[in-house]
Amino acid sequence: MLFRSPPGQYILQSEQALFNQAVTDVFGYYALQIGLPQLNTLQENRVSLKLMLLPHGRATADQNSAYQSIEGIPEELPFADQSIDLVILPHVLEFAQDPHQILREVDRVLIPEGRVVISGFNPASLWGARQYAGRLIGKNYLPREGQFLSLLRIKDWLKLLDYSLDRGHFACYRLPLRKEKNMARMAFLEKMGNRWWPIFGSVFLISAIKRHPGTRLVGRVPKQSLQAIPQLNTAAQQSVQKVLEEV
């Protein structure tokens, strides 16, 4: 798998720093990471309850101890309308058959003024060029299932949903190599790329805020059952309720 390889570990380390910066000042009660349990995107966030959505059958095997794992699919999120403060999509849209539906679901569950943070591979980069060439010769560098989306396209989709773009970053300027020692030799490209050609980083991160009209309670919300997430199955409700009682 990509994220177990030296290039994958390099991506995870780089994105960890990006997510730490993006979520550190985001407050609320519920935060949701969709997939990629190898990455703790909410490490520096202080929300009351951190949830991770994983495919059916993987909620135990891939569980990250920092999260409460929930089984489901991103196209049909098992949460009530306007119930989540923060949603993280690490490399989700580019591997989805219907990324528009995922964004619609994220929009449905986010509270007004809630935030979505998205990461993805940048097609306008050396890694993107390597992937394009690999498809022509039958030797992919990144997973062939990915339909890598440009940052501009994702920005357009978010604007159509009336989201306000908050911040964005590019990262990972090393050459698309496979061996760890060869990638380590390219470390000098990080500072050069960040200064001279930042938009050609191999990965990007974008943060946006939901600007739909709506109201939100001010102050501490009582810890009553699970009205914010009533669509969970019984076992999941009991598990999350236990966590809520300990907050």
Stretch-by-stretch model annotation:
Residues 115-145:
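Conserved class I S-adenosyl-L-methionine
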Residues 164-190, 199-200:
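Conserved catalytic loop of SAM-dependent methyltransferase domains
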Residues 188-247:
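C-terminal lobe and adjacent flexible extensions of AdoMet/dcAdoMet transferase-like proteins
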